[in-house]
């Protein structure tokens, strides 16, 4: 079989490309996905409050593990990635955060990326979005991605935690994706008006899958990209145990994510020559940056008992769950219709940072992100972590076998800045939690526990308990330097007919969750592939901190 375009990976980027490219009826597209369909009757992926469930199995999760992380007590750490139509948008936490404007302005200072400034990217964020309260200079109202804003009457702990952040001297913002990201405020989520997860399978593929020029093949595990010289001409994949090959007339578009995209390139002969030769993989093109520059967000949970019976603890008890499930199933409302990350914020921990370097997610229950280690009492917590770590990792293929997971090392916490930021984050969080807005609710500190105070004690807590935020990125970075893998249009350097379009091409990780930005990247490059003029540059105003102090005097100073 032959198609104009072959897309590898039906995730946050691949589904965007499949939908946009097939808007032209004379273009044929094959979309290959290693996982299965996004079963709409499976509450594990469709109910926002059930977000922990897909991470606990392997039906929707590749369930990668890192190599022993040398600065984290040699722990092998989780690296969950989505498997199935929707990719990681099928199993993520549904937080709709775009990053800070300064992230993109910083990208645009890099050679070859001049058109990736915030005002160049903002029109594509708007194009992708339908926000439930309508459009403005920052938000769209006609896009495929349903974005829900928090509503009146949601859990009172959200409001108390935001107010505590403001009382601690930090800014308030009414829109973390609007004029000013810096500060504490409500958090948008990718949830439909009917209370369902708004994955890219639902938002994009639902409108495209009936087109005659789009072919979707699930349970299709990519083996390698096929080349004639330096030109990509097709893909070899397995449908179950059966090997298949397909040809691409125009381009192969690799959208397999920050772990699998470099793995597939390397297995296909595009990557660091020494690595490939050591595995007896024929070298098609020596490209040393493939799999390098790997970045992620690391986070911790600071947990508190709640003196008032207002947390979500009762929802964790099995005898309350049938009622919650029924309300969600038949009405699309209630606890089940929210991911329960409805407030958070971004702050600068020190004046040396020009834009926020710490992110908060507030949660009105005390539990790990993957659903483990729930505290058996009313509680609440802050997820807190640094945003732009200087630590760099790598992804390396282990063999020619498409079924073997790659070697992954994030090299977490490898710089002194990492340790300083995380110590600061714990101490700042404790100061926030001590503010009067939380006096009514705040019980004892469950984790880390008040006995953990010195730098050495904090460091050991971090080494033992910090976890991934599931934001791998930057492993096929765009740019023009010697370690860049693609140019500003996603085209692989030194190759023809081959692009990478996903979170792996970010040159530096953004300040926030990755899904919204990955969708934006795909929307922007889709116009390039179609040889369309870019959308007109936005003229929206946006906040730059300049010489503004990190914070005002707190209402209640640290004791």
Curated annotation (Swiss-Prot):
It comes from the Bacteria. Pathway: Amine and polyamine biosynthesis; betaine biosynthesis via choline pathway; betaine aldehyde from choline (cytochrome c reductase route): step 1/1. The keyword Membrane does not apply. The keyword Oxidoreductase applies. It catalyses: choline + A = betaine aldehyde + AH2; betaine aldehyde + NAD(+) + H2O = glycine betaine + NADH + 2 H(+). FAD binds at residues 4-33. Residues 182-201 are annotated as: Disordered. Its cofactor is FAD. GO terms for cellular component: membrane. Keywords: FAD, Flavoprotein, NAD, Oxidoreductase. One of its GO terms (molecular function) is flavin adenine dinucleotide binding. SUPFAM superfamilies: FAD-linked reductases, C-terminal domain, FAD/NAD(P)-binding domain. PROSITE patterns: GMC_OXRED_1, GMC_OXRED_2. The active site is at residue 471. InterPro entries: BetA, FAD/NAD-bd_sf, GMC_OxRdtase, GMC_OxRdtase_N, GMC_OxRtase_C. Its EC number is 1.1.99.1, 1.2.1.8. GO terms for biological process: glycine betaine biosynthetic process from choline. It is an enzyme of class 1 (oxidoreductase). Involved in the biosynthesis of the osmoprotectant glycine betaine. Catalyzes the oxidation of choline to betaine aldehyde and betaine aldehyde to glycine betaine at the same rate. Belongs to the GMC oxidoreductase family. This is Oxygen-dependent choline dehydrogenase. It comes from Pectobacterium carotovorum subsp. carotovorum (strain PC1).
């Amino acid at each position: 079989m032959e198609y104009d375009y072959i897309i590898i990976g039906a995730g946050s980027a691949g589904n965007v490309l499949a939908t946009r490219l097939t808007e032209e009826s004379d273009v044929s597209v094959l979309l290959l996905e290693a996982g299965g369909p996004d079963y709409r009757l499976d509450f594990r992926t469709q109910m926002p409050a059930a977000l922990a469930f897909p991470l606990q199995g392997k039906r929707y999760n590749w369930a990668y593990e890192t190599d022993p992380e040398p600065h984290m007590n040699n722990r092998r750490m989780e690296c969950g990635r989505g498997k199935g139509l929707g990719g990681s948008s099928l199993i993520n936490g549904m937080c709709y955060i775009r990053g800070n404007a300064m992230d993109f302005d910083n990208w645009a200072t890099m050679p070859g990326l001049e058109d990736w400034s915030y005002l160049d990217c903002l029109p594509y964020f708007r194009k992708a979005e339908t926000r439930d309260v309508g459009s403005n200079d920052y938000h769209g109202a006609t896009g495929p991605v349903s974005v829900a804003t928090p509503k009146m009457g949601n859990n009172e702990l959200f409001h108390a935690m935001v107010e505590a952040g403001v009382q601690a001297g930090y800014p308030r913002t009414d829109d973390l994706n609007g004029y000013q990201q810096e500060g504490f405020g409500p958090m948008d989520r990718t949830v439909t008006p009917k209370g369902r997860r708004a994955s890219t399978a639902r938002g994009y593929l639902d409108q495209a899958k009936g087109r005659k020029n789009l072919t979707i093949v699930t349970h299709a595990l990519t083996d390698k990209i096929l080349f004639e010289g330096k030109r990509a001409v097709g893909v070899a994949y397995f449908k179950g145990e059966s090997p298949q090959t397909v040809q691409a007339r125009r381009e192969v578009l690799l959208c397999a994510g920050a772990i699998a995209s470099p793995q597939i390139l390397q297995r296909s002969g595009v990557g660091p020559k020494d690595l490939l030769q050591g595995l007896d993989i024929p070298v098609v093109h020596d490209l040393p940056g493939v799999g390098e520059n790997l970045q992620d967000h690391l986070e911790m949970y600071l947990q508190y008992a709640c003196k008032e019976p207002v947390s979500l603890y009762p929802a964790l008890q099995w005898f309350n769950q049938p009622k919650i499930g029924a309300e969600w199933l038949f009405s699309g409302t209630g606890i089940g219709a929210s991911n329960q990350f409805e407030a958070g914020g971004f702050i600068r921990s020190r004046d040396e940072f020009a834009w926020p370097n710490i992110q908060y997610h507030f949660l009105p229950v005390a539990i790990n992100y993957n659903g483990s280690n729930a505290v058996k009492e009313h509680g609440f917590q802050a997820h807190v972590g640094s945003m732009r770590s200087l630590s760099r990792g790598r992804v390396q293929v282990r063999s020619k076998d498409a079924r073997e997971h790659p070697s992954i090392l994030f090299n977490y916490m490898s710089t002194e800045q990492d340790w300083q930021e995380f110590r600061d984050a714990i101490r700042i969080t404790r100061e926030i939690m001590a503010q009067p807005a939380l006096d009514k609710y705040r019980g004892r500190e469950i984790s880390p526990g008040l006995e953990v105070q010195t730098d050495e004690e904090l460091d050991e807590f971090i080494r033992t308990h910090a976890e991934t935020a599931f934001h791998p990125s930057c492993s096929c970075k765009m740019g023009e330097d010697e370690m860049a893998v693609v140019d500003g249009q996603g085209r692989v350097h030194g190759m023809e007919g081959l692009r990478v379009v996903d979170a792996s091409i970010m040159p530096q990780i953004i300040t926030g969750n990755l899904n919204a930005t990955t969708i934006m990247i795909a929307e922007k490059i889709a116009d390039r592939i179609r040889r369309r003029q870019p959308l007109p540059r936005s003229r929206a105003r946006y906040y730059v901190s300049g010489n503004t102090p990190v914070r005002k005097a707190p209402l209640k100073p640290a004791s």
